[in-house]
Curated annotation (Swiss-Prot):
It comes from Sinorhizobium fredii (strain NBRC 101917 / NGR234). The keyword Chaperone applies. An accessory protein needed during the final step in the assembly of 30S ribosomal subunit, possibly for assembly of the head region. Essential for efficient processing of 16S rRNA. May be needed both before and after RbfA during the maturation of 16S rRNA. It has affinity for free ribosomal 30S subunits but not for 70S ribosomes. The keyword Transcription does not apply. NCBIfam families: 16S_RimM (TIGR02273). The PRC barrel domain binds ribosomal protein uS19. It holds the Pfam family RimM. This is Ribosome maturation factor RimM. Binds ribosomal protein uS19. GO terms for molecular function: ribosome binding. Residues 95-178 form the PRC barrel domain.
Length: 187
């Protein structure tokens, strides 16, 4: 049983599929059928899973793992999250403006004056675009859009994100707040 130093979530196992130990898997990889290309997958409890076969369906992939040979063994895996070591991800395949979610977590979000708005504690995609979760000491978590207008620059080496606090919704736009205080009347 191996504990990963820098785990990256790759997939979540769903329901069993058929009688031969196959499972439905929600893959978080760019190409869902490439799930096995990153090496063995690991669970948080230290189990190791070798992918033998992957086939694509409409919303998930169907996966067969070594040692999971019947439906009851497959059913026992339902809800299990699978990880790989961060070093197994191919950095050279990324464009200049592409990042792995795992690389963004822990970066400090600062504005142009150096004011900190917290650190990235999560990256989410609920369907309308990526969101970064920021959490600072003594602050509640806040979600900001991960867009070129909100996040102006990413410096992985310095561990910082340069954000526009107005575009990110972290502060109120002074011009808009004046409009709210003195609404115009319509005739």
């Amino acid at each position: 049983m191996t504990k990963l130093e820098n785990p990256v979530l790759m997939a979540t196992i769903g329901a069993a599929q058929g009688l031969r130990g196959e499972v439905r898997v929600k893959s978080f990889t760019d190409d869902p059928t490439a799930l096995g290309d990153y090496g063995n997958l690991h669970s948080e409890d230290g189990r190791v899973f070798e992918v033998l076969e992957v086939r694509e369906t409409k919303n998930v992939v169907i996966v067969r793992f070594r040692g999971i040979n019947d439906r009851s063994a497959a059913e026992a895996l339902n809800g299990l999250e699978l990880f790989i070591e961060r070093d197994n991800l191919p950095d050279d395949d990324l464009d200049e403006d592409e990042f792995f979610y795992a690389d963004l977590e822990g970066l400090e979000a600062v504005d142009g004056t150096g004011k900190s708005y917290g650190s990235v504690t999560g990256v989410f995609d609920f369907g309308a675009g990526d969101l970064l979760e920021l959490k600072g000491p003594g602050r509640r978590p806040v979600l900001i859009p991960f867009t070129e207008w909100s996040v102006l620059e990413i410096d992985l080496e310095a561990g910082k994100l340069l954000v526009d606090p107005v575009a990110a919704g972290l502060v109120e736009d002074k011009d808009e707040s004046l409009d709210k205080q003195f609404p115009t009347k319509r005739k």
